[in-house]
Amino acid sequence: MLRAFALDPIGTVSIEEMSSVGLLKLSTRTYWRRVWPAGVGLASYIVERFGTEGLRDRDVLDLGCGVGLVGIVCGRLGARVTFLDREAGALAAVRRNCRRNGLAPARTIGGDWNHGGHRVEPDAYDLVVGGDVVYDDLEWPAIGTALMRTLRAGGIALLADPGWVVQRKLRGAFRRSGFTVSRSRRRVSWPPWRTTHLRTKDINIYELGRQPTLSPKGRGQGEGFTSRARSVS
């Protein structure tokens, strides 16, 4: 199923979903086949947060990329994007969706990021994005470790959640992992490809900041982003 997402000012992003799997048959191994509200909210937030120039020539990692909406939006904004997912089918879908949206061939990495089984270069990314990757609080320490390993000093992660997690608990977990934590909220209409019978969903966007170091190593380190989210209380 081909879905179209209108995101000014970059225009329409077309994403192929693997919608042959019905909702009742979804499992953690098939969630990647669909675009979910958190991904739509995160994509919209990224466009507003960075505009048309804020991600140009930045290195971005789409963590648990699924069919690739969020990473493709970053690519349309001029970023160099790496897509990471444990499912080979997801990475194949990303490659098709990148071609569909006029992007260069996608750089993809297969692996289970939350158990250290991936091959992501350390200290290589200015921004890490992830929609619906924080639903299991038992995985938060592993996510924190992965983010600390992959982000450059001064880099940030943007993680989207549709209200499944306890905010204060998440804040504490990632602060213990060494990050600053702030939050924004994005309201999305769902499903976005309809004009009637829409529901609204509030999406929490958590911004995790890795502090710059005094002697950054590698391209772009220490050239961090300015936070625009409000602190979580």
Residue ranges and their predicted role:
Residues 129, 216-217:
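Short conserved micro-motifs on helix faces and helix-strand junctions that flank
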Residues 1-211, 233:
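S-adenosylmethionine-dependent methyltransferases
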Residues 218-222:
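Glycine-biased, low-complexity coil/linker segments
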